[in-house]
């Protein structure tokens, strides 16, 4: 049996017809008590579920809940953070709750939250 190499087996299989390959697979499954389809299906089902479990939120939105008593200070901070003009920043603050920044990293969201809270605003990160 040492005379037959892996390359010989592969060459033999490469020359088989589809029907012969199908019969060979069935014979191997019966002889060794295995199934060619089950492991593939199990891996395919487990793959997406595992990916969802490991997925962590990477983008955050900073939501201005209220300007509080220091509306002018909050408007100034909103302008500095967003680059909006005075009119747009004032409208954003008056329409609270409203997103100040969207889709930013957690560290950046924390910095923006600290800036706005320092000016007297109530802020949430989602």
From Swiss-Prot:
Superkingdom of origin organism: Bacteria
GO MF, one annotated term: structural constituent of ribosome
Keyword terms of this UniProt record: Ribonucleoprotein, Ribosomal protein
Family: Belongs to the bacterial ribosomal protein bL12 family.
One GO term of the biological process aspect: translation
GO annotation, cellular component aspect: cytosolic large ribosomal subunit
Gene3D superfamilies xref list: 3.30.1390.10, Single helix bin
Function: Forms part of the ribosomal stalk which helps the ribosome interact with GTP-bound translation factors. Is thus essential for accurate translation.
Gene label: rplL
Organismal lineage: Bacteria, Pseudomonadati, Thermodesulfobacteriota, Desulfobacteria, Desulfobacterales
Protein's name according to its UniProt entry: Large ribosomal subunit protein bL12
One Pfam family named in its UniProt record: Ribosomal_L12_N
The protein's assembly and partners: Homodimer. Part of the ribosomal stalk of the 50S ribosomal subunit. Forms a multimeric L10(L12)X complex, where L10 forms an elongated spine to which 2 to 4 L12 dimers bind in a sequential fashion. Binds GTP-bound translation factors.
């Amino acid at each position: 049996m040492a005379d037959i190499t892996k390359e010989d087996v592969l060459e033999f299989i490469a020359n088989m017809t589809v029907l012969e390959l199908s019969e060979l697979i069935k014979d191997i499954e019966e002889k060794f008590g295995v199934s060619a389809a089950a492991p593939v299906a199990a891996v395919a089902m487990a793959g997406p579920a595992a990916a969802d479990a490991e997925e962590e939120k990477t983008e955050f939105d900073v939501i201005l809940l209220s300007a509080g008593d220091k509306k002018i200070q909050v408007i100034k901070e909103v302008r500095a953070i967003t680059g909006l003009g005075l009119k747009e920043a004032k409208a954003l603050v008056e329409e609270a709750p409203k997103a100040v920044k969207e889709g930013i990293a957690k560290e950046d969201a924390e910095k923006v939250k600290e800036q706005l809270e320092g000016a007297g605003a109530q802020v949430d990160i989602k």
